[in-house]
Amino acid sequence: MGDLARLPLLEKAPTTHARLLAWVEEVAELTQPDRIHWVDGSEAENKKLTDELVEAGTLKRLNPETFPNSFAAFSDPADVARVEEQTFICSENERDAGFTNNWMAPAEMKQKLRGLFAGSMRGRTMYVIPFVMGHLDAEDPKFGVEITDSAYVVASMRIMARIGTDVLDRITQTDAFFVPALHSLGAPLEAGQADVAWPCNTDKWIVHFPEERSIWSFGSGYGGNALLGKKCYALRIASVMARDEGWLAEHMLILKLTSPEQKTYYISAAFPSACGKTNLALLDPTIKGWKVETLGDDITWMRFGKEGELRAVNPEAGLFGVAPGTGWGTNPNAMRAIAKGNSIFTNVALTDDGGVWWEGMTEETPAHLTDWRGESWTPDSDAPAAHPNSRFCTPIDQIDMLAEEYFSPEGVELSAILFGGRRKTTIPLVTEARNWSNGIFMGSTLSSETTAAAAGAVGVVRRDPMAMLPFIGYDAGDYLNHWVNLSAKANPERLPKIFLVNWFRRTAEGGFAWPGFGDNARVLKWAIERLEGKADAVETPIGFVPTGESIDLEGLDMTPAEVESAVRVDPAEWATELASIEEWFANFGESLPAALQSELDGLKTRLG
């Protein structure tokens, strides 16, 4: 075992899984950690790790009366978001990565990564985290093992995924396939060298090898770059698995809607980051008799059931939400879940009484805070107190409105799929697709103004197909074709209806054309009534939109004429939009599905 005599925990590994042991040994030899710890996921282990993180200054323990068993972390200012320019899909063939992904030949990338990872865990503990995405007792559980040198990652993964001994035992007993997910902060400690509160490296690489189903992440301790079960596995690698196995891994919420007649419907919805996905998943309806429960706020895996129905499951165990804008006024259900504790906050502000705060959390701004950079802050300060991409990480089972179906490995049958972006003009409040193919066209041309969740310019309109642009693990044209072709597996009577929504449309005066938040239930109600054949609509060149009277406005200070204005299809705006869509589709070249070209041609004809 070479130099591994100094790694005593390897001999006492709690598994006999040959591939796993060989991989752990290979990584230990490469990264040279001081010790190896197999994560069991227990309370005692979590307490020990969080105590150590508090002592190291990585975590700050919050006031136990207001935020029980909760902590705040503050990252290096250069490590605050996903790094899309350093995220790679290293497929064997460059064409399979497509134009939306960065690519490097796998052998060349592996050589580069081995150089970076060599000795990268020196002076640190190497944690081995067995995890499962979805349910352990699912028909086809999807396993992973993350190796990391960050205890913050262990504590966060414990919230976000099902981890620990039960998972490892199942991997061992069934000799299961697992996705190896390797993560290092890239901050080795030499003997006697003092650590910093947030170790990271200026050189960051987030790399996926789709054919071998593996992930290597170097240099970042932040969220999606480091919690590898999340975007890296559950979307980028899982989308490739889904392509090969005939299912879908999508950037979507799942909600359960119950009508006053006690009829239930399940809806999934795809929105780019910071477009209200968590708020919709945790919706408090403002219309009488309608009830919303949630099954998930970020990632949905969908498969066809035995009768050709499309079924959805949330593979995650926690919420990893953008904090700013989440407040008692806008999302009380999220706030109640957070108030139960057991949460980790990253890059929020601290109140003087040991609590946390961020923009939009309360109506009144505290008179004094410590901002996310550790500086004294008052409402007169120039910069926001919390980073725009600051996060809360909270167990999903703390949500009072969690639907019991969340715990079902079979998932739920979808009645509708929503696609939504953030556009000030052009896109109506809600549009019903003409059919499945037209709905995929809507999803493929989804667009939004960029947000703080990704590093780079803010406020530029970018196309974001199915809200998956940063997360498609293979060629984007092949991905859209996979969506188109899936309908062949479906029972056409049971295919979900597709709708395009835009909560962010502005009026001519510059205000929002729609109140949003809890009132979005009124749009969901219209969509459900369309499924049931009960609501009126107007046919437009882009699809069906509500009549002014068909949206329930009871109790809302809004007129049918204002609804008509919010769903108006403006020919001049759509002439510009058509040109923009043509430019977008040109990127796909040969891989653009013929069905989508024909949808575009049809739209052109209808717009005249």
UniProtKB/Swiss-Prot annotation:
Substrate binds at residues 82, 222-224, 273, 389-391. Binds 1 Mn(2+) ion per subunit. GO terms for biological process: cellular response to glucose stimulus; gluconeogenesis; glycerol biosynthetic process from pyruvate; oxaloacetate metabolic process; propionate catabolic process; response to lipid; response to starvation. Its cofactor is Mn(2+). Transmembrane segments: none annotated. InterPro entries: PEP_carboxykin_GTP_CS, PEP_carboxykinase_C, PEP_carboxykinase_GTP, PEP_carboxykinase_GTP_C, PEP_carboxykinase_GTP_N, PEP_carboxykinase_N. Keywords: Cytoplasm, Decarboxylase, Gluconeogenesis, GTP-binding, Lyase, Manganese, Metal-binding, Nucleotide-binding. Pathway: Carbohydrate biosynthesis; gluconeogenesis. Its EC number is 4.1.1.32. PROSITE patterns: PEPCK_GTP. It is an enzyme of class 4 (lyase). GTP binds at residues 274-279, 391, 422, 517-520. The active site is at 275. It is found in: Cytoplasm. GO terms for cellular component: cytosol. One of its GO terms (molecular function) is phosphoenolpyruvate carboxykinase (GTP) activity. Pfam families: PEPCK_GTP (PF00821), PEPCK_N (PF17297). It catalyses: oxaloacetate + GTP = phosphoenolpyruvate + GDP + CO2. Mn(2+) binds at residues 231, 251, 298. PANTHER family: PHOSPHOENOLPYRUVATE CARBOXYKINASE, PHOSPHOENOLPYRUVATE CARBOXYKINASE [GTP]-RELATED. Monomer. Belongs to the phosphoenolpyruvate carboxykinase [GTP] family. Catalyzes the conversion of oxaloacetate (OAA) to phosphoenolpyruvate (PEP), the rate-limiting step in the metabolic pathway that produces glucose from lactate and other precursors derived from the citric acid cycle. This is Phosphoenolpyruvate carboxykinase [GTP]. The gene is pckG.
